[in-house]
Amino acid sequence: MGKTDLSSLLAEKLKARLVLENPEENPFLLDFYNEKKRYAFQTQIFFLLSRYKQQQNFLEHDLFMKKVISDYFFEKDKIFASVNLDEKELFLYERIYSLLIKNVPKPDLILYLQSDPQTLYKKLRKKRKKQFQKIELDYLMALNEAYNRYFFHYDETPLLILNSDDFDFQKNPSHLDELLELLKKPQKGRRYYVRR
């Protein structure tokens, strides 16, 4: 089960609004997976601006919504940019990013689903969408390393880290109940949760 499926389950159980990213909207994504260097900047800027727009729409329309579950956090864009862009592109990207991030709300909690890149690679191979078929294991390993490095230093909001390889939220309802109980507890700092 991926982040989108888990977000959907959590939103349903917690009666929360669900906010999903939509990578299929990005007209550069398939080109990026075919020619990373050539299409990285366009792909990344499109994602940055579309995620920013989604965050702004969310702020305008849901001022009184108490619970919101999203399958991404805005800062993820910067993690991908650090892997995908060359030095000059990253410099320009970071200038744009720094202007936008000021207006993006911070989440109350980030749930980081860690997964072994090999396991993730196998799961992506089973998906039918074209863009997932083009993703290489080396790329997943680089992203995994970038995420781990980012979250090792992250302290802006509470962070709960789970190894998603230890859970099967769809097939085993007790795993979802376990997570829901965990989410009811006050969240502070960085916490790792390991199933026993």
Predicted ranges, named:
Residues 39, 43-105:
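Glycine-rich phosphate-binding loop used to anchor ATP phosphates in small-molecule kinases
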Residues 8, 12-50:
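Conserved substrate/cofactor phosphate-moiety recognition/catalytic segment
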Residues 19, 70, 109-111, 160-162:
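Hydrophobic/aromatic beta-strand patches that form the interior of the parallel beta-sheet core
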Residues 77-148:
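A glycine- and Lys/Arg-enriched "phosphate-lid" helix/loop adjacent to the NTP-binding pocket
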Residues 125-133, 138-196:
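NTP-dependent small-molecule kinase module
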Residues 23-26, 74-76, 115-120, 166-169:
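Conserved nucleotide-binding/hydrolysis micro-motifs of P-loop NTPases
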Residues 3-4:
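Walker A/P-loop
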